[in-house]
Structure formats: C-alpha cells, structure tokens
Amino acid sequence: MEKEVIAYLDNETIIDSQSVKNTNLKEIYFDNSKESLEVIRHSCAHLMAQAIKSLYPEAKFFVGPVIEDGFYYDFRVESKIGEEDLVKIEKKMKELAEAKIEISKYEITKNEALAKFQNDDLKQEVLLRIPDGAVSIYKQGEFEDLCRGPHVPNTKFLRFFKLTRVAGAYLDGDEKREMLTRIYGTAFADKESLKEYLTIIEEAKKRDHRKLGTELKLFTFDDEIGGGLPIWLSNGARLRSKLEHMLYKIHRLRGYEPVRGPELLKADAWKISGHYANYKENMYFTQIDEQEYGIKPMNCVGHIKIYQSDVRSYRDLPLKFFEYGVVHRHEKSGVLHGLFRVREFTQDDAHIFCMPSQIKEQVLEILAFVDNLMKLFDFSYEMEISTKPEKAIGDDEIWEVATKALKEALDEQGLKYGIDEGGGAFYGPKIDIKITDALKRKWQCGTIQVDFNLPSRFKLEYTDSDNEKKQPVMLHRAILGSFERFIGILTEHCAGEFPFFIAPTAVGIVPIGEAHIAYAKEIQKELLELNIDSEVYEKNESLSKKIRIAEKQKLPMILVLGDDEVAKRSVALRDRRAKEQKNLSLDEFIKLVKEKMSEVHF
C-alpha cells in the first residue's frame, strides 16, 4: 500500500481523497511522512472510537485530535476502563481494520447536526464551538462522528497501531466539570516504525522526570500546596543553583546586566502592555487598597520600567537586562504535567533594547549563545519562526519588519528553519528553539522575539546622534525557556545522569569504616571549596550497600576510602561516566575534578 494515495496537499491544508477527485494537487502517499501520519492517526482515533462504541454501546464521544506522536479520544462510558481493557479494544480495532470498511464523508448544516445529535450532550458541546455553516461527518460502517478530517478512504490502511495508555481528562480541560475517559494511542504506516516507537516509549518510561525526580530526591508536589507548584528538595535546589550560577556568569560575559522587577504589578501596567485585554485569562489578580493588581505572567513590563528609570542615548544601546524572573500563569489542572507544565516557574529571561539597525547583530549574538549552550548539554536543535496570529497587537507593516529581521539573522547563520504561520505571540513574531533529546523527541524551549509594540505603548525613547527622540526596539529572549521545564527535559535526556559540572552531588565518598570518616570529610571540604558537592556515606552499613546506594543516586564519581587510601592520601575512584576504576593520589584526583569543572567554555 506504500504507493497508494490517501490524501492531497493544498498549500498547507491536507484534503482527504473523499473530498477531492481528479485533482492536480500534490498527492500524499501512504507512508510515514508528516502529512501522511496526520491522516493515518486522525483516522485511527475514529477507528478506536468505533471499537469502543461496539464494546460499550452507551459510549458518548467528545473530541479525538491528532497530537505529537499519536492521538487520543475523550469519551464517557458507564463502566470504568483501565489499562487491562486496552487489549480488547485493540483486538476490536484490528477486526474493523481487517474488515476493510469504506470511510465516507458527508456534510449537513449546523442546525441539522444539532438535531441529529440532540440526545448527545457531548456532541452538543462540540457543536457549540463550530461556526455556523456546513458541518462534516465521517462514517465507517455503523459508526459516524463529527470531524473536519482528513481521513484515509478505508480502514484497511489502519493496521499498525498501539493504544498506549488510559487516563482521566476533565471536560474541555476544566477541573470544575466532569471527568471523561481519555485513551492515547499512536499509529504508523509500517510495522518497523511502530516497533521502533514503542521501544522509545518504554525507554521514556524509565527516564520519566517525575519518576527520577522522586528517586533522586530532586523535587516533589503536594496537594496541600496546590497543583503545578513544584517544591524543590535539596538535591534539586543544588542542581538548579549550579545551572543558575553558570548562566549568570555566561550572561555577564556577554554584556547583560542583572536586574529584578516585582512579581506583583498594578493592573494599570498590564492594561498599557495589552496583557489585560489579551492575556487576562492566564493571569492571577488580587485587590490591594481597593486597587487591582496582577501577578506577572511575564517579566517584560518590569524591564521596561527599568529602561525608563534613566535618560537613554544611542550611545547606551544596546541595553541588555536579564533576570531569573518568577512568573505565574493559570493552567487548567488537566494539563499540568510534572515540571513540563506548571503554574509557577522561573524564566532565564532577558530583554534587549536596541536601535532598529542593531536587531540582526543582536539576534546573531543570541543564536551563538543558544548554540554554545545546547552543545554543552549535547542537545541538537532546530529553529522555527512563528508569524502573526489572528489575535494580535500592531499593524501588518510592523510585523513584516520584525519577521524579516528574524529571517535574515537565521539565513546569515546558515540555519534551517520552519515557519509556523499564525503561531506568534500577540505582541510580535518569534523564533522558537526546539531541542531534540536522546530519544529523538522534540521539545519547545527558548524563544527570541522582536517587539516594536511595547516600546510604542510605553512611549520608550532614546536620543539619537542628531539629538532627536527615537523609539527603541525591544527583543524578548529566553534560551532555556524556564528552569523547571529545562531541568525536566535534561533529566530525561541524560536519564538522571547529570553532567559533572551541574550534578547535585558530583562525588559520593564511601569510607569503609569509622576510622576513615575524618579523611572522607577532609576531601568533602576540599571539594566544596571548588564548588563541587559531595556526600559522605558514613552510616554503619556494609561497603557493598553504601556503594549500591551511591550508584542508585547516579553519582558521576564514587570514592572508596580504606586504610591504604588514608595512609597514602589517595582515593579508589569509580568513574560512572568513563566506566572505569582506578587509584589516584588525592592531588591527582583534585586535578581531575578541576579539569572536569573547567570543561565548560563560553
């Protein structure tokens, strides 16, 4: 079936073969291309729904979209569905696929659809979100559902799929509404690709940062504190602190000035910025002395006020402010996920105020910063430019100038990039930095944004060489995105085996007996003076148990100290990363760890 056409491509729009006949549009073949997988997975979501309806006749369905690497469907059933039920649902799906059922499409008006599904409250919910006009329905056998498509023309194309997990999901992501059942799955065009993906999924489960965060005692969450509010334990706080200190030095070397703005600002400031009108639903507000205040979801307004605190000349530009800014954003509880999606997080945020002629130069410098940092952590990455969304501030000309500046910088660096039409923030176009981890998964992290809008709204000025007042350009920039998300990604990328220079505990020191503890603590103190954290395992336990405990913590290095080491002032080193054991003098060991720490270059 590799050469069979399953859909067509009209510019960026995928159109299924049920909708188009005798076309000159680009053909989408049955394979593992991005467009083909979107059609296959969308169709497989309906195949799963058809199987569920067959097994659970009372089932009612909400939405079943394609997501990164797969699909899901939210639905309501009377009985509880668990992981053990996925096998029988898969079995029914295979039966339906083997039956080679034709998939057809027809259209009715919205009013006709409301009447057709009058006894289905979930379908009524879906129809409320659909604009007036024609509504498309896809039918396969006795099963039919509202859908924009596209779908494959026959269930025979849906052979290589896997249901991966079952979960609860609040209706429309609102925790105040009922909990529906959600089943996730994936699908491919061939058996080998599915097998490869499932292998990655199994490895991802072992690397899950929520699991490793607990095992390595990095962070925790507590219902009494609230969802999406991470609590950093000692190990996690040390890891984060090392990352923060390293980035602080890098920023200073690149000419950034540290600043700090308040976390609570009057609503008036958010009205000027446009956040109040365009981002209010994502913010938290309170009343103080009968005035409305908003907790900041972004750091830009504080940095603007720092810019306005002094008279600025063209000789001062570019001005580069950076802050580890704590921000809060309202997220529905249904989308919270470990450190990846939280309500409070800290951005490695910077804002650069410059002249229009300096935009490309500054973006190029940021791109070099990104490249150095990603190489340090062994991440590959790609760039994507997001353009003007439907809901935006500023006229088209301003957006065009800003978007062009980003493209020119990327072109000059020779970097390939994609275009996300309409994916920009409401106040300007942006470059999204997407990193690829050890499991070949892509993650959205940092951003670079050009902003002509906020300088205009806040009436920012500088005096040019002709002594005339001009408006600066503002560049928003975060490279990691947030410490929380990046640490979550890094944890999974390296499976909890952090690089030596940021490992929360870089060295485990194991004295064999009580007589060796004093020497162990002497080494610990010397390491701490080098900003290297270590732990002495001094409990009255067997040597093998102490080593096993240290190994479970995935420490880069373990030192074993006995009579011989104390007498010779040496160490027995187990290097987890180099996978070797050797004896070194203490001086040689200290020299080794100094070299490890000096490997971080910028």
From Swiss-Prot:
Main location as per UniProt: cytoplasm
Cofactor(s) named in the record: Zn(2+)
A Pfam match: tRNA-synt_2b
Record-level Gene Ontology MF annotations: ATP binding; metal ion binding; threonine-tRNA ligase activity; tRNA binding
Root EC class: ligase
Residue numbers spanned by region Catalytic: 208-499
Binding site for Zn(2+): 300, 351, 476
SUPFAM superfamilies: Class II aaRS ABD-related, Class II aaRS and biotin synthetases, ThrRS/AlaRS common domain
Keyword annotations of the record: Aminoacyl-tRNA synthetase, ATP-binding, Cytoplasm, Ligase, Metal-binding, Nucleotide-binding, Protein biosynthesis, RNA-binding, tRNA-binding, Zinc
Compartments where found: Cytoplasm
Cofactor comment text: Binds 1 zinc ion per subunit.
CDD domains xrefs: ThrRS_anticodon, ThrRS_core
GO biological process assignments: threonyl-tRNA aminoacylation
Family matches, as InterPro entries: aa-tRNA-synt_IIb, aa-tRNA-synth_II, aa-tRNA-synth_II/BPL/LPL, Anticodon-bd, Anticodon-bd_dom_sf, Thr-tRNA-ligase_IIa, Thr/Ala-tRNA-synth_IIc_edit, ThrRS_anticodon
GO cellular component terms listed in the entry, alphabetical order: cytosol
Catalytic activity of the protein: tRNA(Thr) + L-threonine + ATP = L-threonyl-tRNA(Thr) + AMP + diphosphate + H(+)
Superkingdom of the organism of origin: Bacteria
Known EC number: 6.1.1.3
PROSITE patterns recorded: AA_TRNA_LIGASE_II (PS50862)
Assembly: Homodimer.
PANTHER family, A to Z: THREONINE--TRNA LIGASE, CHLOROPLASTIC_MITOCHONDRIAL 2, THREONINE-TRNA LIGASE
Function: Catalyzes the attachment of threonine to tRNA(Thr) in a two-step reaction: L-threonine is first activated by ATP to form Thr-AMP and then transferred to the acceptor end of tRNA(Thr). Also edits incorrectly charged L-seryl-tRNA(Thr).
Similarity annotation: Belongs to the class-II aminoacyl-tRNA synthetase family.
This protein's name: Threonine--tRNA ligase
Species this protein is from: Campylobacter jejuni (strain RM1221)
Gene: thrS
